[in-house]
Amino acid sequence: MPAVPDVDEVATLARQLRAQLVRHAAAGTWAAPGGRSPRPARDEAEPDVPAAPRRSLAQVRAELGECTRCKLHTTRRSIVFGVGAEDAPLMFVGEAPGEQEDKRGEPFVGPAGELLDKMIEAMGWSRQTVYIANILMCRPPGNRNPQPDEVAQCKPFLDAKIRAIAPRVIVALGRPSANTLLGTDAPISVLRGKFHDRHGVRVMPTFHPAYLLREPDRKRDAWADLKLVIAELDRLGIAAPGTPRG
């Protein structure tokens, strides 16, 4: 006749069983009847990758250093990191610095920047109350479009800036910005006019101010996009520091 376990042994086995059941419940992997393998939870196949730690903008800038991660460092004058409020609920992301931005080390300071300032002010905000950045932080020669290897080196720092600022809404200025932020190759004409979700942040693609200077008839469409941003911020309970015009 097999030995009967004592009370302490039974209590220990019971605690181990309860712990095992709790682990299975948390993982969504209860044992199935008849010895069949349990059906995996919906996200069980994905590795448990911890979220990147949130750093301050100063920490992100310090990590960037005097960046030499891509070939653009050989032709740039300045690293154009970004400008604005470090806790801005509204962020604008463009494409890359131009000649004036490269000289001054600040995004959107040329003619396109003057137009962007007017657009932001028309929404009731300012350069000081939003945050402005670009996909690339170094000027591409001849103001050409960003190349994939350049974007790949800059994007982790853009992601870190977005985590540091934690905006509620991002306005993506132009196709390269929208494509990079949203992971798509769709044209801006398809993406604009509606919100897209990026890890819980609302993204509104619209035309780049430089394009609007070349095609002023599209300013009406861009303003329609920005009015949607104003309405979304209002829905989120975020008041602009000023009063929008019109």
Summary of predicted features, one role per range:
Residues 1-16:
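Charged, compositionally biased N-terminal leader segments and the immediate start
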Residues 2-3, 18-246:
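A polyanion-binding, active-site-adjacent surface
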